[in-house]
């Protein structure tokens, strides 16, 4: 992608024009180019560019795009420090002010660079920071598949990979993109090994709490397979997660014994109870195609007058599909999502698909025999 230049002249003259412009705006910079070459000129121009950020947006973008265009023609080994310096200025300058301009400038730099240049990591992290500061994360690319590709293309170290994913996670949370944030956190935790899983203790703890707090999250068994989460075995947070994965209303006893712990997590008991009732109902619906109102009252610890309202709310989550039979005071289940999906569920899925395959073959053979007659 080409980046618009400040003026269509040689690099040296362009640097001189930039120096003169910045000088005219009050910057402490010489109008004469440095004898050290273009990269030294750019270092001094970037250092003094604060003054132009105060100008009209169109002028600023033109000037800064000129800086970007000069940066992009430097040798890669001379680019990195200068790009880091420019990014730092754009992230920190009057933090919170003129976010759309700063995003545009960083985006121009990011998309103007070679796709495999490792220093794009710095620019992308800066984009995330600025977008998060103004609630504009939707205006930058955050799709997990694309981020994975960049991590590979840039050949990031493990530390930088973790930094990027953690930064992206926090930005998505701040911008209330909970579904995307959860996927990024799972990606982050999944990137740890047994050797460094202990380093992700805080992230694992945060991931569990956010998942339990999310009103639209009901399946948690995948979290138990993550190495940093396994590292928390024996702690209350892991016990709580295990209850939400497969237990019924064992949560009630856990809460009675650990009320202060639940409160310290910022979790609300009533919301936890509502979620546990739904999870318990999902488990019941997997095992039974018909469930009496009396059984539901007993298992879910709800009153007779609350059964129908509970079922309606459960169906709205799309985790359970069922009908209410008021005459016989029962619920007829057509489908329920499994709370855990292990070897047994994979076998059931295989058997179902295999049965469909055999039935389709029978239909095919029947049609072929009819066409032959």
UniProtKB/Swiss-Prot annotation:
Sites of Phosphoserine modification: 2, 152, 366
Keyword Cytoplasm: yes
Cellular localisation: Cytoplasm
Keywords: Acetylation, Cytoplasm, Initiation factor, Phosphoprotein, Protein biosynthesis
GO molecular function annotations of the record: translation initiation factor activity
Modified residues (N-acetylserine): 2
Pfam families xrefs: eIF3m_C_helix, PCI
Domain PCI: from-to ranges: 180-338
GO biological process, one term: formation of cytoplasmic translation initiation complex
Any single Gene Ontology cellular-component annotation: eukaryotic translation initiation factor 3 complex
Residues recorded with modification N6-acetyllysine: 253
UniProt cross-references to SUPFAM superfamilies, sorted A to Z: ARM repeat (SSF48371), Winged helix' DNA-binding domain (SSF46785)
Principal subcellular localization: cytoplasm
Signal peptide (UniProt feature, chain positions): none
Record note on quaternary structure: Component of the eukaryotic translation initiation factor 3 (eIF-3) complex, which is composed of 13 subunits: EIF3A, EIF3B, EIF3C, EIF3D, EIF3E, EIF3F, EIF3G, EIF3H, EIF3I, EIF3J, EIF3K, EIF3L and EIF3M. The eIF-3 complex appears to include 3 stable modules: module A is composed of EIF3A, EIF3B, EIF3G and EIF3I; module B is composed of EIF3F, EIF3H, and EIF3M; and module C is composed of EIF3C, EIF3D, EIF3E, EIF3K and EIF3L. EIF3C of module C binds EIF3B of module A and EIF3H of module B, thereby linking the three modules. EIF3J is a labile subunit that binds to the eIF-3 complex via EIF3B.
Stated family: Belongs to the eIF-3 subunit M family.
Function: Component of the eukaryotic translation initiation factor 3 (eIF-3) complex, which is required for several steps in the initiation of protein synthesis. The eIF-3 complex associates with the 40S ribosome and facilitates the recruitment of eIF-1, eIF-1A, eIF-2:GTP:methionyl-tRNAi and eIF-5 to form the 43S pre-initiation complex (43S PIC). The eIF-3 complex stimulates mRNA recruitment to the 43S PIC and scanning of the mRNA for AUG recognition.
PANTHER family, per database record: COP9 SIGNALOSOME COMPLEX SUBUNIT 7/DENDRITIC CELL PROTEIN GA17, EUKARYOTIC TRANSLATION INITIATION FACTOR 3 SUBUNIT M
Designated name of the protein: Eukaryotic translation initiation factor 3 subunit M
Gene expressing this chain: EIF3M
